[in-house]
Amino acid sequence: MRRPPRTGRRDRGQAAIEYLGFLPVLLIVGLAGLQLGIAAYAAQQAGTAARAGARAASSDAEDGPDAQAAATAAVSGWIDPAASTSLGGDEVTVTVTVRIPSVVPFVGDFGTVEKTATMPLPDEEDE
């Protein structure tokens, strides 16, 4: 009498091989999602810094902070904003540039995010 061939033994370990093949794709997608979230966070922080810098630059307080100090104080400690101020008529505009941090290995730079905020200067009649 003849035995039927055993085909089940050849599939042993197939799931592990498929998992190992899919793991790099899963890691790349996860890192891309994390990097996208960090880029959005950097943009949000740049906007916060621009508004804080414009608010400080439009203040008529004599001992008030300058725009760069206010922008730096308004963001997380691991973000280093660069602020530039321009006066135009009865308003002040502050532009803040923030570098996007990278979490992806072997990729050095994802560029910068730039946000601008404009605030009115106080009227001289109010003094």
Q: Positions of the model-derived regions?
A:
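Short, conserved structural patches
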Residues: R2-P4, G64-E127
